[in-house]
């Protein structure tokens, strides 16, 4: 049963009438451009064919009722006429409440709604299940009440909800690619202007995501530390963000910077340059160059930004040894575990899956999870 069928049938069963709309918003994988988004830089993600799906309908009153199908049909209910506050015991509820609260703060006029939510974006893997949920909820109210919001505004609203209501500092990339993704394309995003450029993916290329299943523990605290180090670097150069610092300017005075901050800055500057070049390599179908750029990105995350772990490095080595110069592989996401992403010819997928299955667990004691994805369409009706 598809997510659409599941949420529609559950909606009718629980609420006693049929849903009028079913909305989907995808998860994402970032092909290259890591920890550049909050430095006003460039990222190159694609939406993937794992998504959050919501069947919904308007209500005549000012109540919002939500059923989380993936959490034993837990219920949340709140009024649009009372201050929307965080839910103490149901973390998933806060993503919904936060999005609705921030839609209100943007002076959108809308009434109540019934929602049934289900999704298949792997959670805790760095594939943006939370952004997918935020964008799906924003799109629900936009569609039900014809709100004058475009995809970028729905994305910004989701980011605000996550930063200010849920209390997690995130850049704009995850929400933006979920809202604006394009089938068979990656999206080069300028995180300062929110300008996007669709980059066609070469035919016959698979997007493979492998979850290391290494339990991420440091990600929250270390993420904030990295962010502070980048801001320190920008202040040193008297610039609003590292986006405004050239590599030449950095190299001229790198020795004057705190050595750790210097490494963090170098990663961001070189990663921005790699990301812009990667978009052009991908468009030309130059998988060899794309692979080189992904390898440089991984080395930079490992050595300069210091956000990889041995398990992730092992996965990258296994995949790289199998695909050679026919594609690329790197860690993707915030770091300290999570996933690697690989671009490779579809014909090589079985060999990569076999190599990882025989070597990764033997070397690390952990069993991986392997996903083959298609670059997919952003949020909308399904």
UniProtKB/Swiss-Prot annotation:
One of its GO terms (cellular component) is cytosol. The record marks 28 as: Transition state stabilizer. One of its GO terms (molecular function) is galactokinase activity. GO terms for biological process: galactose metabolic process. SUPFAM superfamilies: GHMP Kinase, C-terminal domain, Ribosomal protein S5 domain 2-like. It catalyses: alpha-D-galactose + ATP = alpha-D-galactose 1-phosphate + ADP + H(+). It comes from the Bacteria. It is found in: Cytoplasm. Pathway: Carbohydrate metabolism; galactose metabolism. Its EC number is 2.7.1.6. The keyword Chloroplast does not apply. It holds the Pfam family GHMP_kinases_C. InterPro entries: Galactokinase (IPR000705), Galactokinase_bac (IPR022963), Galactokinase_CS (IPR019741), GalKase_N (IPR019539), GHMP_kinase_C_dom (IPR013750), GHMP_kinase_C_sf (IPR036554), GHMP_kinase_N_dom (IPR006204), GHMP_knse_ATP-bd_CS (IPR006203). ATP binds at residues 124-130. The keyword Transferase applies. Belongs to the GHMP kinase family. GalK subfamily. This is Galactokinase.
């Amino acid at each position: 049963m598809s997510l659409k069928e599941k949420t529609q049938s559950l909606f009718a069963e629980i609420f006693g009438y049929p849903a009028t709309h079913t909305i989907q918003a995808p998860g994402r994988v970032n092909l290259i451009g890591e920890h550049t988004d909050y430095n006003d830089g460039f990222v190159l993600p694609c939406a993937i064919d794992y998504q959050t799906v919501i069947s919904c309908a308007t209500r005549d009153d000012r109540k919002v009722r939500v059923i989380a199908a993936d959490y034993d049909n837990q219920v949340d209910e709140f009024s649009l006429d009372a201050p929307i506050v965080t839910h103490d015991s149901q973390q998933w509820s806060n993503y919904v409440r936060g999005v609705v609260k921030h839609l209100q703060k943007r002076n959108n006029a809308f009434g109540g709604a019934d929602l049934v939510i289900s999704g298949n974006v792997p959670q805790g893997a760095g594939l943006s299940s939370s952004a997918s949920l935020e964008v799906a909820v924003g799109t629900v109210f936009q569609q039900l009440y014809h709100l004058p919001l475009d995809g970028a505004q729905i994305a910004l609203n989701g980011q605000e909800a996550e930063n200010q209501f849920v209390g997690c500092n995130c850049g704009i990339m995850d929400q933006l690619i979920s809202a604006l993704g394009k089938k068979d394309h990656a999206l080069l995003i300028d995180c300062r202007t929110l300008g996007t450029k669709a980059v066609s993916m070469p035919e016959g290329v698979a997007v493979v995501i492998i979850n290391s299943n290494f339990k991420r523990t440091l990600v929250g605290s270390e993420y904030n530390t990295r962010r502070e180090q980048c801001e320190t670097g920008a202040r040193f150069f008297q610039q609003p963000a590292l986006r405004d610092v050239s590599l030449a300017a950095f190299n001229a005075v790198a020795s004057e910077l705190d050595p750790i901050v210097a490494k963090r800055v170098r990663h961001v500057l070189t990663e921005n340059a790699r990301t812009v070049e990667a978009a052009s390599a991908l468009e030309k179908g130059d998988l060899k160059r794309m692979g080189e750029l992904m390898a440089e990105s991984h080395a930079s995350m490992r050595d300069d930004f210091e956000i990889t772990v041995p398990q992730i490095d092992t996965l990258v080595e296994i995949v790289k040894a199998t695909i050679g110069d026919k594609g690329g592989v790197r860690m993707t996401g915030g770091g300290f575990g999570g996933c690697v992403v690989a671009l490779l010819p579809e014909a090589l997928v079985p060999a990569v899956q076999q190599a990882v299955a025989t070597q990764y667990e033997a070397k690390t004691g952990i069993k991986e999870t392997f996903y083959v994805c298609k670059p997919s369409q952003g949020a909308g009706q399904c």
